[in-house]
Amino acid sequence: MPDLLPYLGQAAYLQLESFQALSRVVGQVDDLSAKEKVALAAGASLSKHQGIIAEIRRRGDDPADVMKPFADAIDGFSVLTTGSDWRETLLAVEVTSGLLDDFFIRLAAGLPGDVGPRIAALLGSDGGQDGVMDVLRTEIGADPQLASRLAMWGRRLVGDTLLVARSALHLSGNTRTDEERIEPIFTELIAAHTRRMDALGLTA
């Protein structure tokens, strides 16, 4: 069971980071249709961030104070997952947000009271992924060499993202039982990630 405030603080800052990354991509994309699709995804991340912030405020806590312990680590994660061009960065947001949203939805089941269902519904809401996938598919179709580069980049992203997921777990200190508890969750996350990559025609 995750501790409520650290869970909310980390989840909120991750959504804020996703919004910032997508906003940067909007400024780098030339095609107006693609800009709109990425902007919609950025708006969805911001809405999720604001929803989590509302939960923090509902408890009478300051969102900045609750997010602060996670800022440096997530900022570092953002640097690691910023691509060499906007297409790599867009895939990075799709991969990392997909994995982490799925992960935090699963963790939400352990939150007290009715917070868990609210957060799970919020994180599971439409995040504009269909539009992002459309943009990526168009780019891959226009550049035959892009697919292999993005596939390799996507594989690298998974390891860094799962480290962030592990940092959100409340572990008992018993390595064997902790691993037994974590393994099924991570197996499900990887399966969902593989389906997303397959939808782009990329090898996970």
Residue ranges and their predicted role:
Residues 105-162:
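A contiguous pocket-lining binding segment that forms or flanks enzyme active sites
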Residues 14-22, 48, 69, 96-103, ...:
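Amphipathic, well-ordered alpha-helical segments in soluble domains
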Residues 1-9, 70-93:
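Acidic/His metal-coordination segments adjacent to aromatic residues that form catalytic metal sites
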Residues 15, 89-101, 186, 190-201:
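Extended alpha-helical coiled-coil scaffold domains characteristic of the BAR superfamily
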Residues 3-8, 32-47, 89-90, 114-131, ...:
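Alpha-helical scaffold segments that form or flank carboxylate-/histidine-based iron centers
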Residues 146-204:
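Extended, helix-rich structural scaffolds rather than catalytic motifs
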Residues 41-70:
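Conserved alpha-helical segments that form or flank metal/cofactor-binding pockets of metalloenzymes
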Residues 18-39, 81, 97-112:
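Helix-loop segments that flank and shape redox-cofactor active sites
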